[in-house]
Amino acid sequence: MTTYRELLARRDEFAIYSPEWKEIGDLIDAYVRAQILAGHMEFANMIVSDLGDIAEYGAYENDPELKKEYDGYIEWFRKWNFNEYADELESFIEQ
């Protein structure tokens, strides 16, 4: 959990769509998915909470990159039978 938060804390050092931020984002994504697959569901809850907060502010409709990431997590949660998390993410964008 600390690694996830430490990496997120560095995001202000980079432009959001810079190659450097993409590399950090890819590390975060791989780390989080590995933690979820290992059974650390607090990471799934964090992802749903973080993405849900962003979606509630309209970013899902207005930011194609975020939409891609968001939809990717829905698909990934379904692939690994974490349907309750996919359902929760979908509920944020249906509101």
Task: Kindly give the residue locations of the regions a language model identified.
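Acidic, low-complexity, intrinsically disordered interaction modules
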Residues: 22-89
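Short acidic DE-rich linear segments
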Residues: 91-95
